[in-house]
Amino acid sequence: MNLLRPKLKYFILAILIIAADLYTKYLANTYLEFAQSLKITSFFNLTLLYNHGAAFSLLSNDQTSWQMIMFSTISLIAAIVLIYLIIKQPITEKINLFSFALILGGALGNFYDRAFQGYVIDFLDFHIGNYHWPSFNIADSAITCGVVILIAASLFTKKKS
C-alpha cells in the first residue's frame, strides 16, 4: 500500500470525475426533456440524448445487445489497463499519471451507464448556427482532455537520453 500512497491522488481524481459525470447525468436525466434543447448561450444548449453507440454517437443507429456488451467490455478492459498504468508509471511522470486518471474516470463513468442502462446519457450540445457538434458528457470531456494531454506531452516533451 505504501507504494500506491503517492498515486492515491490520481485515483481520487478518477473517482471525482466519475462522481461529477454521474451526478450531471442524473441532473440532465431528471430535469431535461428528451431531445428538447434548453438554450444556454448562442452556441451552447443542454439537450438530453441517449447514446447507444460509441463516442460522438458512432454506430448509435444499431442498438443491439452485442454492441452494448462490446462497448462495455472495451471500457472495462481500458479501465483495467489504465489502473495498471497508473500503478506502474513512475511517480515523476505526473503528466502521464494525470492523463491516465482523466481517461480512467471517463471510461468508468460511461461504463456505468452502458452496464446499468444500456446507453450513455449525453447532454452537452455545442453548435455554430445549425451545425451541432455531437452531444457529449463530462466523461467524454475527461477522456478527450486526457488523450490530448498525453499526445501534447509526447510531442513537446524531450526524451531523456
UniProtKB/Swiss-Prot annotation:
Which biological pathway?
A: Protein modification; lipoprotein biosynthesis (signal peptide cleavage)
Subcellular location, record wording? Cell inner membrane
State which Enzyme Commission number(s) the record gives: 3.4.23.36
The transmembrane segments are 8-28, 40-60, 67-87, 91-111, 136-156
Q: Which InterPro entries match?
A: Peptidase_A8
Catalytic residues identified in the record: D122, D140
The record's GO CC annotations read:
plasma membrane
Q: Which reaction does it catalyse?
A: Release of signal peptides from bacterial membrane prolipoproteins. Hydrolyzes -Xaa-Yaa-Zaa-|-(S,diacylglyceryl)Cys-, in which Xaa is hydrophobic (preferably Leu), and Yaa (Ala or Ser) and Zaa (Gly or Ala) have small, neutral side chains
Q: Name one Pfam family in it.
A: Peptidase_A8
What this chain does, per the entry, is described as: This protein specifically catalyzes the removal of signal peptides from prolipoproteins.
What this protein is called in its record is Lipoprotein signal peptidase
Which family is it part of? Answer: Belongs to the peptidase A8 family.
Query: Which UniProt key words apply to this protein?
Result: Aspartyl protease, Cell inner membrane, Cell membrane, Hydrolase, Membrane, Protease, Transmembrane, Transmembrane helix
Q: Name one GO biological process term.
A: proteolysis
Molecular function in Gene Ontology: aspartic-type endopeptidase activity
Stated membrane topology is: Multi-pass membrane protein
Residue ranges of coiled coil = none
UniProt main location, coarse: membrane
Q: Which domain of life is it from?
A: Bacteria
